[in-house]
Amino acid sequence: LAPARWFDQRSVYHAFNVYEHIARVLTVAGELALCDGVAPSSSLMWAAFLHDVSKPDCFTVDHAGSGHFYGHPELGAKKARVIMDRLALSHDLVRDVCLLIKYHDKPLRPERSCLLNMMRALSGEGVDTPRLMDELMDLKRADTLGKAPSCFYYVETIEEMRALARELLAAGEPYTLKMLAINGGDLIRVGVKPGPELGQLLNAALDAVIEDNVPN
């Protein structure tokens, strides 16, 4: 994190340099978890600690003199993996932290399809998607509160998204192929030949269900 010290973000959305921002996000993430009545998880705290680790590497300045950090979530996830692997941390922890970092800055809306697609991106072998989705909201909330006060309004939207995501999960709305009411065997029985087309059709079906164009 040394390059982040005194690194001016040159943005109206940030009241602090990169290092101070990271410190505040880390502190807020832990304190708000305790306020919610739970101990902050290791994955949340590591993600808060490393979420902007690649900002100095991605810094650009536009014609108006404003700073931008395009690609820092993706590069940050890669750098975090290297750091955490070097520390011999568990595979599951590294995987979850990298997912949180990769998507911490992704624009989201409190809409069904948007949140189901986010869960789809977070899902994978061994991933506890409901927990990780909630931690993504925790990270976004802490990240927002570590910016300029003019950004704080977004916390209300984050809580709207959290509530809707929990409703979707409780209702069993599908966000993975395994959650579809049909599978590859069903397609084969109606004449689809085994091969890549099966996966393409199932993914198209999941797209349609997520967009609420067809029922599951």
Q: What annotation goes with each model-predicted range?
A:
Residues 2-7, 97-99, 197-208:
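Short linear loop/turn motifs
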Residues 21, 93, 194-197:
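Helical mechanochemical/support elements of P-loop NTPase systems and associated helical scaffolds
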Residues 8-10, 60-64, 185-186, 205-208:
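Glycine- and acidic
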Residues 23-26, 77-78, 180-185:
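A generic alpha-helix surface/boundary motif
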Residues 1-33, 120-122:
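Long, charged alpha-helical interface segments
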Residues 17, 29-157:
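Divalent metal-dependent catalytic cores for phosphoryl transfer on phosphate-bearing substrates
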Residues 37, 41, 82-86, 146-216:
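Charged substrate- and nucleic-acid-binding regions of tRNA-handling and nucleotidyl-transfer enzymes
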